[in-house]
């Protein structure tokens, strides 16, 4: 038991030190140390998007708007923790709110493309014509130096005209060189970016297909393996990569459901393309109609007063716990401070953006953390008054309260999961902050409070029943 307490104390100390590093300015050198505030707390940018019909999608129906809204949200907020608000306005417009973003160029660029990815194979009928036109063009190009030396202006002009004509014909044929296959961006599960293994200081875009997409990719690469014909990867109809497939894949093609786009990308371009593909392709193009800078809903004075009120309320809770529950209350105060530190560290690590609903979720989780400690201490008092020893009372108090705490927190986490799954924007933010707070409160109430309590009673000066219950005399 003593070894276990020492281990848990060391773990708690390690977590506290790690959390301090994360939430303090020291963490800024690692890209941490800062909690993002939402649009209602610090302002930001607001984009109005116009959804435009196409020849394929002539009517912008509610289903189309819902699909566009989902893709926009997935592109701008792939992890689902930044409180970006994406909502429809009218029949053909979408409003996007970006908290804390004063220059939304990245967001505008992220939404500028439909991002329809497709894989294409060479058209064998066109391939023969391309080879013929390429040979003819090469022969004409070889004649140019001789014509220039001859000094016959008319003959040179005629030859240059023929070269331009052949180049035009070749370009037209090359536009038809690739034909679409059934492998598209719809078959992707995920997309990312990684440092290129073949080109220094360049980046590749990594793709992972779903089960059907993996099978299609294997079949496509098998048919091209060893032929010398390129596999074309196109984005919105433009070629972004062409690669040949080695003959060692003749038997089964490239299996495993993964692919790499080696397009000589810079980091920002690779990240942009990966986020576009991860978010999915837009069913119709969108155009940024308006960009506005939005001020915070609450002024600085209101925010400052709210912070003071929150700190004052927390101090009153800490004082009440210490006065009413004596030593266990003081231990609970320490556990609550650890809880707050760990929770804020989680918010920083997960990139959570705090808004007013998010703060409400955090405050609610504090209440649940206090409630868990109260359950434990009341159970402990009951055991003490029944005549049990101090150690047995504490052990039994934690054991009897555990089921109630677990049931309460699990049901809350289920509710948070439902809100996160079905909600969006501010509702998701409330669910995330509450869910993280509840999960951390379970750890601090059961592990932190328990470890500190047993550590306290291991000290002779603190092993006194009157420090736990004033109504029971010292035995």
From Swiss-Prot:
The chain crosses the membrane at residues 7-27, 305-327, 334-356, 357-377, 402-422, 429-449. It comes from Acaryochloris marina (strain MBIC 11017). This is Protein translocase subunit SecD. One of its GO terms (cellular component) is plasma membrane. Belongs to the SecD/SecF family. SecD subfamily. The gene is secD. The lineage of its organism: Bacteria, Bacillati, Cyanobacteriota, Cyanophyceae, Acaryochloridales. GO terms for biological process: intracellular protein transmembrane transport; protein targeting; protein transport by the Sec complex. The keyword Transport applies. It is found in: Cell inner membrane. Part of the Sec protein translocase complex. Interacts with the SecYEG preprotein conducting channel. SecDF uses the proton motive force (PMF) to complete protein translocation after the ATP-dependent function of SecA. Probably participates in protein translocation into and across both the cytoplasmic and thylakoid membranes in cyanobacterial cells. GO terms for molecular function: protein-transporting ATPase activity. It is a multi-pass membrane protein. The keyword Cell wall biogenesis/degradation does not apply. It comes from the Bacteria. Keywords: Cell inner membrane, Cell membrane, Membrane, Protein transport, Translocation, Transmembrane, Transmembrane helix, Transport.
